[in-house]
Amino acid sequence: MASLHFPQWAVSFVFFAQAVGSMDTFIAAVYEHAVILPNKTESPVSTEEALLLINKNIDILESAIKLAARQGAHIIVTPEDGIYGWIFTRETIYPYLEDIPDPEVNWIPCRDPRRFGYTPVQERLSCLAKENSIYIMANIGDKKPCNATDPHCPPDGRYQYNTNVVFDSKGRLTARYHKYNLFEPEIQFDFPKDSELVTFDTPFGKFGIFTCFDIFSYDPAVVVVKDTQVDSVLLPTAWYNTLPLLSAVPFHSVWARAMGVNVLAANTHNTSMHMTGSGIYSPEAVRVYHYDMETESGQLLLSELRSRPRQHATPAEVNWSAYARTVKPFSSGQADFPGKIYFDEFSFTKLTGSAGNYTVCQKDLCCHLTYKMSESRMDEVYVLGAFDGLHTVEGQYYLQICTLLKCQTTNSRTCGEPVGSAFTKFEEFSLSGTFRTKYVFPQIVLSGSQLALERYYEVSRDGRLRSRGGAPLPILVMALYGRVFERDPPRLGQGPGKLQ
C-alpha cells in the first residue's frame, strides 16, 4: 500500500504563513508522487482497467491535495505522468485518454460530467478542486479525432497529447496545455502544430504552464515569461536526473532566478530511474525542495510566495561575457584532454594545486577559473571543462557550458561521470566564460547533491559566478549552463508527430 510522507517542518511553516499571509502572497504546494505504474503490455487494456489504475494514483494525490488545502494552500501542482505512468506505446495509452475541451467552454465537470462525453478523470479532479477550494494542476492525456482532410492527421485518425489541466477552486476547467517539446521516448504522443502560450489569472497572480522538456526550449518556456508577463510558472515533470549537470532541483531553481518568476516544479518519484527532485522556487531564493534517492515515498512541499514578484526590485541584467573577454587566458602548462558529459565531448583541464588560475577553451567559448581550496586532497581530482556545441541525444539543442567538477575517481577517464560526495572544500572561486548568449543558468551542487545556499555565492553583473566568503563549500559541480537558442536546429515537420 502506498504511503504519504509529509515533512513536519513544512507543515509547521505553513501554519505560520497562513496566519500572516494575504493575497499579496499565496501558499503554493507541489507533490512529488511515486506513481503506481501499469503492467507493460503490447495490447491495450480496457477502459475500465485503465480507470482502475488512474483512480489508484488519484487516491494518493487526493490525500496530498486535502492535506495541502487544510494547511492553507491556494494551488497544488502534481507531476507529469502522475496518474498513469509512462510505460506505453501509442496504442496502449489510448484507454487512459479523455477528450479535454477548450477551457473557453466554461465547464465544471463536477456539476456536468457528461457534457463532453465520458470524462471520469476530469470529473474527479474537478470535484477535488471544488470540494477543497484549491486550484489543482494535473497532467493527463487528451485525444482529438481527425481525418484525411487534415494533411497532418496520424494514420490512426487521432491526435494524442501530453496535456496539463488546471481546475480552479470552484472546480472549473481554467487551463489546458498540450506539451510542445516532447522528450524523444514519448512515442505515445503527438505535439501540436503550433506552440501554445497558456496562461490563467488568479487572485494571487498570473500563471503560465509548460511541461518538463519544454524548459530547454525558447518556445514556449521563455516566450510565455517574456511575452505574457506571468508571475509564476507551473512545471509538472517526469525528470530523471543526469548528473553532473542536469539534475532537476539545480536547473529548475536557477531557471526561476534567471527568468524572474516563481516556479512550482513537481517531479515523479522513481529511484530506479533516478526520478526525484521537486521544489518551490522564487527569483530570490529556493523556498523549499525535496531530493530523495533513498526511499520510495511521495512528498508534499508547501511554501509562501509573493504573488507578483515582478513588482519587486530585480537584479540588473548580467552581461555574461563582460569579464571573461577582458581576461588573458591563463596558462597551466598542461594539455587539455577530452571527456564526455551526457554524450557531449567536453575539453577538460586538471586542477593541480590547492589554488590557481585556469583557462580551457572549445570553439568560441573560453572558460576562466580562479580558486582556492582549504587543502588539496590526493584522493579527489577536479577539472575545469568547456563545451560549445550541439547536443544531439534525446533532443537537439545548442549549448555553451563552463563547469568545475569532481571526477568520479582519480582516473581522468572518469571525469564527467556522476559523483555523490566530495570532501575537498573551496574557500574561494570565480568562474566565467565568453558566452554568446544571455541565457546562462549558474548552479552549484554540493556533496550529497545539496544546493549551495545563496548567501555563499553571487553572480556579478560582469558575468562571474563567485564566492561571497563564509564556510568553505564541498563542491561536486559548479557550472554556467548556457543555452544558445538561435543556434538550435529547426523543428523537422510542421505537424504532430515524433520529434527528430
From Swiss-Prot:
InterPro entries: Biotinidase-like_euk, Biotinidase/VNN, C-N_Hydrolase, C-N_Hydrolase_sf, Vanin_C. This is Vascular non-inflammatory molecule 3. Glycans are attached at residues 39, 147, 270, 319, 357. Its main location: membrane. Pfam families: CN_hydrolase (PF00795), Vanin_C (PF19018). Belongs to the carbon-nitrogen hydrolase superfamily. BTD/VNN family. It comes from the Eukaryota. Residues 470-500 form a propeptide. One of its GO terms (molecular function) is pantetheine hydrolase activity. Ubiquitous with higher expression in liver. Keywords: Cell membrane, Glycoprotein, GPI-anchor, Hydrolase, Lipoprotein, Membrane, Signal. A lipid is attached at residue 469 (GPI-anchor amidated glycine). It is a lipid-anchor; GPI-anchor. The gene is Vnn3. GO terms for cellular component: extracellular space; plasma membrane; side of membrane. It is found in: Cell membrane.
